Structures are given as structure tokens and as C-alpha cells.
Amino acid sequence: RNALRAIGVPDDEYDPERASAFLADMCRVRAEWVNETTRKELERSLELEAAGAEGLKATPEGVFENAIENRSVSAGTAIASAVDGWSAIEAARQVGADAQKRWVTTSRNPRPSHAAMAGVTVGIDEKFPNGMDWPGDWAGGPDEVCGCQCEIELVTRI
């Protein structure tokens, strides 16, 4: 709704039902990423444990502790970024706004690929040069998405 207000469109012109497919796909992809990362970390922890290593990720218990203390925060941030970016773009599309989208890098320590995107503006239906439609777009894969704090700014054409 904030995205609608930003471009001067009444809230009731947005159809929230169209978000259902996006949210289902996003949750499916994110669950796959979480499960794959957890599997890899568990396999590695068993190797480390067998070798007598110590540390947070050196036991299966430590893998889950790390997931709760660290990975969950990073995942939550990335999911919020993805939903925010997608919803702004979808709202503009649904109301037929003549708008562009600008990548806004907000992190104090962004990954280099996201720092390079700062201020890049493209058409609402175009991909950014990194192949993503918005920050948090799973097209970037987990290495580009996890922990992403970037945002989208809608730019209306006058």
C-alpha cells in the first residue's frame, strides 16, 4: 500500500489476490535454499566432528544453533526485501503506472555486485543489469539474495 500511495494511487485499486502465486513460489524457493544449506552444513559438521574439530558449526547441534542465531536473521531480511521490492513493482503494474524502478543499496557493507547496482534505473518491466527484477529476486540465487538489504524506489515519469 505504501508503494501505491507513493505514486498517488488509491489503496483499493490493488488486488492482493495476485500476490498469492508470488508468495507461494518465494516460500518454496526459500525453503529449498534453507534445506540445501542446512544439509551441506550438517554434512560438513559430521566431517569436522569426526576430525575432532570444535566450534559452532563442528557439530549438528551447532549447525542448528547457527541457523537460529544467524541464518534466520539474514533470511528474514532477504525475504522482507524481496516482498517489498516485488510488491512495489506489482502495485505499479496493476494500476498501469508509467514508472521506472531504481535499485537502492542501503547496507553499510554491501556485496560488490549490489554496490554496483546503486542508483541504476530501468523500466518497470525490465530486469536490472544483474538479471534480477528487484532486490531479493530469487533469480539471483542464494549468493546474491541472502542477507540483501537493498530496496526498490519507484520513479514516475512526468
Per-segment meaning from a language model:
Residues 1-147, 153-158:
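Domain-core detector
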